[in-house]
């Protein structure tokens, strides 16, 4: 079997593995008494991750360069990163809901790359002179892994909003750094709560009134875990995004003589950085937990997709892959 046929077999195999994996996770969420399904789903994600690693390795051998230079390659690299980050997040959370959230995204990316892209966009081509640089691996791979981490973290925030139905809840665990400690007490006589927020060392007290959703202990524990793991995964993706942007600026200066040219991709990378910087700032310095940072991360989910795929398909700028519809 030649390398091209091997790649075709591996991308089809990845799709064939991820589809039943998704069904396992969703069935496990719908029927919690079926205890073995999450383990099958985890195994499916791990096997899919290995298939994509083998596909990228075969592509590297065929083309002679790190396989991340076109849309097909970057989509599979992103899906590989998603499945890897998923395995980390699932280990941290121990929840089958992680797979129920991330497996559809991984499956959709693989299906788009394997079955939607035109054949000419799936073929390896010689690198243009500007891409014949070690910065290709440094910049693009770090950016793609950061996208994967930010997407998984944002999806966990979406899952948090689903579990809590978008309502304010009491979170007893702490997933913040130096932020204020907040304790919420439920007023049994009404649907309102009086929340007392004490800032460390300031002596100030703020009294707030807002409805708080009452959850079963299992749901409350799950929501707290999703909030915590989402924060940690986004905390992993943000420094990688920062490193990737800096590496891209250095590469741009070497290739075109300018660190920053306000290319659409550069602009949206900056917007993405600002959104998640605001998220981390709110959590670390303001002590945000629960609904508000989850909403901000959900916005970030859309921003990442615009940054990665939206501006690339417009056919404009130095990062364009070209529109194909």
Curated annotation (Swiss-Prot):
Gene Ontology CC: one annotated term: plasma membrane-derived thylakoid membrane
Domain of life: Bacteria
Subcellular location: Cellular thylakoid membrane
GO molecular function: heme binding
Record-annotated membrane-spanning stretches: 14-34, 36-56, 68-88, 97-117, 142-162, 233-253, 260-280, 294-314
GO biological process: cytochrome complex assembly
Keywords assigned: Cytochrome c-type biogenesis, Membrane, Thylakoid, Transmembrane, Transmembrane helix
Pfam families: Cytochrom_C_asm
Claim: Transmembrane is one of the keywords in the record: yes
Membrane topology annotation: Multi-pass membrane protein
Keyword Thylakoid: yes
Known role: Required during biogenesis of c-type cytochromes (cytochrome c6 and cytochrome f) at the step of heme attachment.
Oligomeric form and interacting partners: May interact with ccs1.
PANTHER family the record matches: CYTOCHROME B_B6 PROTEIN-RELATED (PTHR30071:SF1), HEME EXPORTER PROTEIN C (PTHR30071)
Family stated for the protein in its record: Belongs to the CcmF/CycK/Ccl1/NrfE/CcsA family.
Protein name (database record): Cytochrome c biogenesis protein CcsA
Source species taxonomy: Bacteria, Bacillati, Cyanobacteriota, Cyanophyceae, Synechococcales
